[in-house]
């Protein structure tokens, strides 16, 4: 395997290179003076135990069969129960590509920067959790193995009809993960799971109960990344003022600059309006809209950014009920602020960062401070338009107006005042491409049509791709919206869309993205599918 770059949702990047017995992760952001790179190493290998039948065929004990290269075999005879002797073979081989349930991983070593450059993490357990999360983030971005399982009961079943199983990886209690009570802490954080859910009889974490831990693909993508991602705090923090990152904090705010041969002028080094306040208040500060284009900050401003360098996970609002128009429903949390990015993720198939931010009423363009992909963005001139100008240009296109109607100046001011919904702008590397609405189904007209079938925390989406160059990526941004809905509140069980019945293109994209068609619904203004 060749080295590859992993782009994290918060903008951090790591170079992953194969090393002896596993892979090395080197940070591209934690620059320091030492020669030894900052990062860690993981050991990944494949363990397989097979039953050899009398006819020479094999079946995996844990339900997976793969073509085997040469490796270490250990054969033992077992009784099949009908008097016929069978052999079990256990094989450990180097990791080549992911298997369905036979891969094993542990963190073998960790290299941290000097404490003279970066302060120690506030919690060593949090640091190990982030390292394991990043390692799993890389692993579950590999090519997914075949879902078919070859078990003892199905060894004569055709391959296309064999049962399917979860994609998961075993986490071995070894190396860095041998720390006292570390595995139980990671399990309580939701990062690890075990099928041994009894109390047990051991008084510590040294028994087999804590040695059989695993992470499945399904559970990993349901974990909020904000729970694990953070950055180390520099001993000398970078300045939020553009152009002055190399100046000491206690230097004068202005330096004399020669202009001609007769006089000196003071070059202003004051911060750009809003940037310093943004750094001081995050997370939670409103995004400034009076910053000139092209100004960059020291760190990408994402939902993961915090000046305290701690994880930015916030639990959902506790359950309490209220009434709206004689409808009883849970009290909803306030959505993010206008212009605030609430979702960010790198999409490898596109090679760009997908972001969603709340639409803004500002007459000025909303600046983008989020992470950027490795290539220059498409159509950067769109970032110079305000949200109102973007919507007006998108509504003017016949394919959009056919389903959304004509644009009016009151459209966006009306939507931002809705209590059960908020508008969003989708971006590829900071360039706007579409308009979306995220709403609570129960208080929406959809909830009224469904009657009592709408769940308390079901979400709904209205979608519109305004730019022609961004079409054809529906599966990527659709799964991003669903991912945000499911991770921001784990009580959300359903994400609904009700496109018009003649919108064949979006119906096709929904089928390809994993949505299921429930039924047709009759609204006062349309027939939906």
Swiss-Prot record:
Gene3D superfamilies: 3.40.630.30. The active site is at residue 498. It holds the Pfam family Acetyltransf_8. GO terms for cellular component: cytosol. Disulfide bonds: none annotated. Keywords: Acyltransferase, Cytoplasm, Transferase, Virulence. Disruption phenotype: Leads to increased sensitivity to oxidative stress and iron-starvation, reduced conidial germination as well as reduced virulence. Reduces the ferricrocin yield to half but increases significantly the production of beauverichelin A and fusarinine C. Substrate binds at residue 462. Pathway: Siderophore biosynthesis. Belongs to the lysine N-acyltransferase mbtK family. This is N5-hydroxyornithine acetylase sidL. It comes from Beauveria bassiana (strain ARSEF 2860).
